[in-house]
């Protein structure tokens, strides 16, 4: 197995922008909105030079699959991939902050070429689903593995003085709902 590196390869980086507005409302209420944008300038991409010409067939979803490779990988880079997200949060408290409610929603659109969640070329290339172009990775992106497109969060927090004011007791409820499935098949 040979792992080669593009001679022009550099460390991955991206441009990021964030803008947030927070509003203190009346009656112990708070509202916030945030926008985040992340654009890839350089990210990992992998090419398996031994797959060229070794097309074995087509998968039911239209992607090409290849016969076994020799295990040689060439690491290069891509400028494709981006993340855009909006998030909203609301808090309200009652009874001198003894009862608190927190609600939040986020909407994220994230695309990347390779997930790059491992420490070696082979596992980054072989573990994660990729675009359907192993020879020209700069031509395609796919939904990212790392971001849930929608997320809802809620908490309810109550502080009681069951054992006196010096030893407060907290009751805490937490709720989370994310889009997607806990497992996927690729």
What are these regions (language model features)?
Residues 44-50, 113-120, 184-186:
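Outer-membrane beta-barrel translocator domains and adjoining extracellular loop/strand segments
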Residues 153, 157-186:
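Conserved small-residue
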Residues 1-74:
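Solvent-exposed loop/turn elements at secondary-structure boundaries
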């Amino acid at each position: 197995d040979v792992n080669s590196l593009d001679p022009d390869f550099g460390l991955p980086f991206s441009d990021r922008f964030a803008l947030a507005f927070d509003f203190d409302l009346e009656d112990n209420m708070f509202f916030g909105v945030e926008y985040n944008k992340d654009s890839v300038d350089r990210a990992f991409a992998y090419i398996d030079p031994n797959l060229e010409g070794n097309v074995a067939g087509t998968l039911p979803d239209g992607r090409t699959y290849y016969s076994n490779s020799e295990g040689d990988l060439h690491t290069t880079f891509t400028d494709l991939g981006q993340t855009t997200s909006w998030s909203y949060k609301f808090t309200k408290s009652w009874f001198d902050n003894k009862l608190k409610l927190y609600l939040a929603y986020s909407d994220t659109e994230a695309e990347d070429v390779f997930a790059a969640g491992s420490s070696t070329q082979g596992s980054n290339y072989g573990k994660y689903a990729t675009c359907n172009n192993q020879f020209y990775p700069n031509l395609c992106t796919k939904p990212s593995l790392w971001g849930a497109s929608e997320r809802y969060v809620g908490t309810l927090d109550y502080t009681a003085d069951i054992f006196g004011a010096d030893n407060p007791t907290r009751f805490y409820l937490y709720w989370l709902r994310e889009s997607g499935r806990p497992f996927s098949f690729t």
